[in-house]
């Protein structure tokens, strides 16, 4: 069995815990790879075990950090590796255990006492090409000029769903429903469901409300005059500028995010995390 280790790069405690996990697994006789960016911030790992995240080929990834660390893994890895998230971040909605539970969790993982939680992702096509990472949380199409609204139409399966003047629009997965989409007035969505939430950001018309559509849908977003540049953000991690005539289509991705879980509990766990964090 081979493990990969990825840590939050700007928190010393996360890097030190990553080394303890690395040492524990090596002493236990397992092959371990370490993300190069983790190594660059704590060069105590054996250099022969260090590879870029894009080249990981492992059975499990141990992520020591927050949601941003997990999103970095999801954007850079080429396969859907199961991730055990250890919360060393601010929110930690995607993580499974707290730091003091790390080695108990590893023991359960090694004993096979876990299950895999699969989450849908969305895929974005710009002018027909899949040139950006799949989103685990959301795509946000934003005004490219601060202080200026954008005028957009969005279609679901070819039918006009809404026309908005707003700061932009969010297309979210159930996993992302506790993030940016929630701030835009979207609902909390049970992560076991597969669907899209479409949420306009600060729309002028009060009648423009978030909507929920099936995950089988194709969503097309069409900019309207006055023509201004747009910014596409994927999970708040990837950014690209779009010209006003860019064709934007969003579908369910064939890929999944996969998480190691020890509990099947959804309620009250997720609502409690929302209240606790905010």
UniProtKB/Swiss-Prot annotation:
Positions with a binding annotation for NAD(+): 67-68, 72, 137-138, 148, 165, 167, 178-183, 237
Cellular component annotations (GO), alphabetically ordered: cytoplasm
UniProt record, GO biological process: NAD metabolic process; NADP biosynthetic process
Disulphide bond pairs: none
Keywords recorded for this protein, A-Z: ATP-binding, Cytoplasm, Kinase, NAD, NADP, Nucleotide-binding, Transferase
Catalytic activities: NAD(+) + ATP = ADP + NADP(+) + H(+)
Active-site residue numbers: 67 (proton acceptor)
Cofactor(s) recorded in Swiss-Prot or TrEMBL: a divalent metal cation
Compartments in which it is found: Cytoplasm
One Pfam family from the record: NAD_kinase
Function as written in the Swiss-Prot or TrEMBL entry: Involved in the regulation of the intracellular balance of NAD and NADP, and is a key enzyme in the biosynthesis of NADP. Catalyzes specifically the phosphorylation on 2'-hydroxyl of the adenosine moiety of NAD to yield NADP.
Family: Belongs to the NAD kinase family.
Protein name: NAD kinase
Organism listed in the record: Thermococcus gammatolerans (strain DSM 15229 / JCM 11827 / EJ3)
